[in-house]
């Protein structure tokens, strides 16, 4: 499973002063506001942002990759990805993906958020070759808010929140790869889940 190493320790490091005083950590919410995170949400936001950084790294290494879901979990995070025919990600590929993630972190990219009307959201995802995101938009209620987070060249449909800059992600480790059916339905395509 892909996890932030010692996530609880890292979360405390991000929000604790060496003398034990709290240091506020801000997150970017989908309404565009940057607000201080409650302490119990810090680990989740770090993990969620790490999933986006991992997806960006995979997209840089595998430009034809098509992404489905990439949530934070209780133990880390993952992203489900559809790779072109004949292309597979295995644990042998983890060092290259982790190296690209480290580059993205070092670039200190700012997370930004924008809301789009349904037609524009679909057009954006179609233009980027993200068929699973288009299907997800189609499944949303007509009055749903559709927001996208961007860091650098990478854009992902997401409700957030996220860290403000990629440099806030201090440590991570790819730990596994498995298969996962799109939407958890065995009648759908098997995707690659990277943890």
What are these regions (language model features)?
Residues 41-61, 72:
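Active/ligand-binding-proximal structured segments within catalytic/core domains
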């Amino acid at each position: 499973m892909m996890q932030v190493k010692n996530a609880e320790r890292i979360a405390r490091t991000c929000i604790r002063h060496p003398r034990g005083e709290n240091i506020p950590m801000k997150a970017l919410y989908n309404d565009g506001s940057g607000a201080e995170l409650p302490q119990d949400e810090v680990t989740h936001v770090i993990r969620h942002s790490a999933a986006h950084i991992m997806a960006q790294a995979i997209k840089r290494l595998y430009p034809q990759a098509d992404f489905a879901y990439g949530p934070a979990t209780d133990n880390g995070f993952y992203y489900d990805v559809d790779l072109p025919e004949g292309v597979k990600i295995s644990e042998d590929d983890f060092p290259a993906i982790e190296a690209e993630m480290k580059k993205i972190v070092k670039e200190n990219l700012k997370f930004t958020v924008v809301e789009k009307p349904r037609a524009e959201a679909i057009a954006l995802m179609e233009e980027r070759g993200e068929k699973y995101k288009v299907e997800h938009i189609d499944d949303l209620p007509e009055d749903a808010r559709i927001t996208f987070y961007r860091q650098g060249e990478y854009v992902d449909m997401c409700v957030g929140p996220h860290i403000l800059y990629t440099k806030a992600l201090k440590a991570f480790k790819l730990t596994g790869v498995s298969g996962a059916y799109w939407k958890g339905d065995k009648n759908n395509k098997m995707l690659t889940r990277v943890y």
